[in-house]
């Protein structure tokens, strides 16, 4: 490890620190919580003489906010907002390994590669004499991205607000200005239980669900394909779970499905529910009961790529245009709070949550250089 660059060493140390989201099922209780990462970042800020504070989010879980003041009066603000939590893994996943130019370990890709590149650039700029004259740079380590995004939602509610936020996620160093929203809906049908030998005396709730499933998997996607966003394409629908009945010889009196509806800008949770109900009505299908399975909104992200500060980041990252992605990130809650947000970072989303998660050290280095160039050129 002594031969590693300061950036690679920072990533190694971050991956070594377990930070499994405690809201997710995990049998290794000692490996849960973001507090150790927050303390680690706090220590780095303290030794560099940089101002920091905590932001309470959930019991025992806090965002860490580290602020780099400009040389003059604050006129603008930029936030770097990677999340500190990771998904569950076995203890050996927190023993980093480097092979063929890649660092392996839980969170290497999602998203400690982003923490390392963002925070290293932040600390490097703090040592520079010529820091931005009027732009405050704020590094925020967020909790709970992997579950309910409580960290970014609290940041959006309490502030600070900024001219731009960059949420750290594995984007292969592409600049993301749009992503789909996410709506989970439970649909339920009712029936009447009866003995399996005399089904005529019951009403089969699974049979009642059958035309609903057929509509959601065949007719509804055709309707959605007619609607497109320039960066995101069409919205999607997926039936993720189904539950019904207790045993083969009993006519089921209830059936439930959970659907995952990915939304594009212009759609709302209510408009989606109304659209599905109208489709059932049009096809003369008895509508099931609708209930949301999430208590917080997850709308799509749609940041204007023509914003001057977005164009500045594109130039710093050597990209000509922004892209869209189908998955949900902290950028959406942050943008809901009034701060335009992008998504950016080293690594491939295909590696996120995988058993042998890894990130290219070369990509981490390139991300750090892009962030540093961007921050250095701020006014």
Label the predicted regions:
Residues 1-2, 36, 56, 177, ...:
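Metal-dependent amide/peptide-bond hydrolase catalytic core
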Residues 2-108, 127-133, 348:
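Acidic/His- and Gly-rich active-site-bordering loop/insert found
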Residues 53, 78-80, 140, 164-166, ...:
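Hydrophobic/aromatic beta-strand patches that form the interior of the parallel beta-sheet core
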Residues 99, 121-138, 216-226, 362:
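Phosphate-handling active-site elements
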Residues 102-117, 195, 344:
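Glycine/serine-rich anion-binding loops at beta->alpha junctions
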Residues 111-112, 116-184, 379:
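Acidic/histidine-rich catalytic neighborhood of metal-dependent amide-processing enzymes
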């Amino acid at each position: 490890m002594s031969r590693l660059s300061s950036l690679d060493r920072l990533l190694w140390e971050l991956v070594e620190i377990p930070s499994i989201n405690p809201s997710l099922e995990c049998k290794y209780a000692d490996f849960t919580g973001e507090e150790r990462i927050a303390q680690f970042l706090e220590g780095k800020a303290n030794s560099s003489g940089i101002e920091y504070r905590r932001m309470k989010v959930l019991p025992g879980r806090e965002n860490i906010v580290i602020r780099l003041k400009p040389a003059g009066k604050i006129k603008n603000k930029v936030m770097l907002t990677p999340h500190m939590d990771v998904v569950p893994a076995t203890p050996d996943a927190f023993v980093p390994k480097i092979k063929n130019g890649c660092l392996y370990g839980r969170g290497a890709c999602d998203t400690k590669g982003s923490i390392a590149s963002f925070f290293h650039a932040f600390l490097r700029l703090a040592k520079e004499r010529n820091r931005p004259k009027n732009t405050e740079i704020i590094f925020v380590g967020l909790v709970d991205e992997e579950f309910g995004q409580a960290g970014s939602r609290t940041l959006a509610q309490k502030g600070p607000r900024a001219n731009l936020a960059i949420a750290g996620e594995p984007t292969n160093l592409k600049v993301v200005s749009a992503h789909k929203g996410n709506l989970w809906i439970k649909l339920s049908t009712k029936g009447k239980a009866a003995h399996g030998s005399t089904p005529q005396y019951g009403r089969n709730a699974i049979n009642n669900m059958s035309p609903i499933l057929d509509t959601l998997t065949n007719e509804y996607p055709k309707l959605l394909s007619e609607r497109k966003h320039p960066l995101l394409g069409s919205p999607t629908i997926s039936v993720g779970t189904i539950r019904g009945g207790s045993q083969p010889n009993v006519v089921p009196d209830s059936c439930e499905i959970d659907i995952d509806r990915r939304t594009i800008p212009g759609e709302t949770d209510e408009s989606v529910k109304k659209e599905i109900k109208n489709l059932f009505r049009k096809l003369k299908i008895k509508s099931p009961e609708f209930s949301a399975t999430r208590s917080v909104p997850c709308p799509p992200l749609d940041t204007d790529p023509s914003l001057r500060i977005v164009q500045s980041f594109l130039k710093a990252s050597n990209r000509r245009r922004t892209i869209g992605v189908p998955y949900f990130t902290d950028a959406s809650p942050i943008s809901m709070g009034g701060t335009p947000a992008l998504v950016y970072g080293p690594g491939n989303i295909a590696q996120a949550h995988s058993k042998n998660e890894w990130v290219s050290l070369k990509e981490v280095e390139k991300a750090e250089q892009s962030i540093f160039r961007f921050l250095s050129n701020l006014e």
